[in-house]
């Protein structure tokens, strides 16, 4: 619903009691500035298909360096061996064979969790991310956020006039703004939005909008006109 945790306060509370903190940052990464180290979290992860503008199949995992030695990998794969030297006897000259050399040392980086060859869809997404991440970095998450906030504030101001209740905190600065109205799915709102070619996330009694740099105030006004 757009609520944002004070992660530093959460982490301080958890760490004082010996607990570790995992943060799902899928609605943060790429949508607004976020310093994963300053937040204090021990783990953070996100997909690439939302605000990073990628697709399904790849994601990102952050693990605080001091926590890495405490982890156990569930699956072992050859990407996790930092010095793998594979030799396949059928393709080597006579006498050239030597044993495969490898070492599964202690965890030192993200490769500790990688399992093996990426699937075709993941490879395609990797190519897509090489472009989308450059685009997001060039724009800058702070600029993306600054562009979006006036759009969200306008929505928070106007949508309640149509019988909705805003369930997003009024000072939220994230990428989503949500509204609730009982019986929304059975009303004429979904039909009106579809006719106006306005695409939002609709539930039975709620809807969520996620404006970004590819939207402007004209899009907001078109959405409001479709509601009325």
Which residues does each PLM region occupy?
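Pyridoxal 5′-phosphate
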Residues: 1-228
């Amino acid at each position: 619903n757009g609520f944002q945790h004070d992660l530093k306060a959460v982490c301080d509370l958890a760490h004082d009691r010996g607990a570790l903190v995992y943060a799902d940052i899928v609605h943060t990464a790429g949508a607004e500035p976020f310093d994963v180290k300053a937040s204090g979290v021990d783990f953070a992860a996100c997909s690439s298909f939302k605000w990073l503008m990628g697709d399904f199949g790849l994601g990102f995992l952050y693990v605080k360096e001091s926590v890495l030695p405490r982890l156990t990998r569930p699956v072992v794969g050859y990407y996790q061996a930092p010095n793998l030297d594979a030799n396949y006897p059928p393709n080597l000259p006579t006498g050239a064979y030597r044993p495969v050399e490898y070492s599964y040392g202690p965890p030192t980086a993200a490769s500790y969790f990688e399992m093996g060859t990426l699937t075709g869809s993941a490879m395609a997404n990797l190519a897509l991310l090489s472009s989308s991440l450059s685009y997001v970095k060039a724009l800058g998450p702070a600029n993306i956020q600054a562009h979006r906030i006036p759009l969200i504030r306008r929505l928070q101001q106007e949508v309640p006039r149509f019988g909705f209740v805003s369930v997003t905190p009024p000072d939220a600065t994230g990428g989503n703004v949500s509204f609730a109205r009982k019986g929304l799915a059975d009303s004429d709102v979904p039909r009106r939005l579809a006719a106006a070619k306005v695409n939002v996330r609709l539930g039975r009694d709620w809807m969520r909008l996620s404006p970004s740099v590819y939207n402007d105030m004209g899009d907001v006004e078109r959405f409001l006109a479709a509601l009325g």
